[in-house]
Amino acid sequence: MNYPLHPRRWRAFVHVTLVAGVVGLGAISLPAAGEPEPLWAYGFLTPPAPGDKAAPQAPPSRALRPNEEAGEQTKLRQVAGSKASYSRVDVRDGGHVIDWFPEDHPLMTPIIANGPAAMGLLARGCASCHLPTGKGRPENAPVTGLPLAYFIRQIEDFRSGARQSADPRKPNTVTMAVLAKAMTDEEVRLAAEYFGAMPWTPWTRVIETDLVPKTRISGNLFLPIEKERTEPIAGRIIEVPEDEEQAEGLRNPRSGFIAYVPVGSVKRGENLVTTGGISVVDGKVVLGKTIACMTCHGPDLKGLADIPGIAGRSPSYLVRQLYDMQQGARKGPSAPLMQPVVANLNGDDLVAIAAYVTSLVPPPIDGGHGSGAGKH
């Protein structure tokens, strides 16, 4: 499918198409305020209590923490394929982002490596969370390959408060608002151009399963306690590092993730994503509960104009955004376009959609990494 329209005309076309879809559905409900929060997507085990809000994230620091041994924390380490050496203190210094593989991305500008200049020592570089490659992690956002206009609009939404989290405890939403307000327009543009210059490449392996490893949560990220799968998946998606030491301990941007998804969710998600959930009952076509995703995101779900690609991205992130939009936590200019898409979706629908979308662009078979969705 070619993109023949100016971005503004394309957005108008999408709006008309979605309105037509809503009319075809008959009606949509108001956002499902009573739909239970997918706690796993936000990295929590229990719902927020009244008045709960995010604790501010500590600024980057190289100081030793209680009970840390100096020699262990300052010992230089390496990862396979890299000529660089860094200590654990270097790894966690978000104001001076480490770079294992400079050949994998453009030259990092100060906003990427060090953060907003106006924040001084309190700043953290974009790559401290999203990594130099922009692939992000399950607890934050994959920002590589985003259209420039979309990227800039998200920063503006964080600045204005139009982009928030449906779970008020999510700390990096608060951090993003602080950083966005401190960034100059030039820094925003440089960050958008940096991440937008890189095409998205997948690194999440989807596995359908009834059982998952027992996990613990650190910084809203699930980490496996054991390799054996003994815990029922219970309708969740559990996204964990392929190698905890590489991904978490060393922030290796080549070490990806596994997304355990319920058996059958990829196939069910395919129907929701490609048709909106249309079915045939007694020979009659029954319209589904949503609108096909390619209406806006393109036939391969890799984006169109200033609408972002979603194929192959973190399922935890995808579910958070769908739920945030459903609950009205995202109020930016694009949010109204998504309302008819998410209004009637329940938790199982969100899981199925994310499982399928992530499985569309499997990571390459490399060093034992799998290449797509499968039941294991």
Task: Give a label for each model feature.
Residues 34-124, 166-292, 327-376:
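Flexible coil segments in periplasmic/lumen-exposed cytochrome c-class electron-transfer proteins
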Residues 14-27:
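Bacterial N-terminal signal peptides
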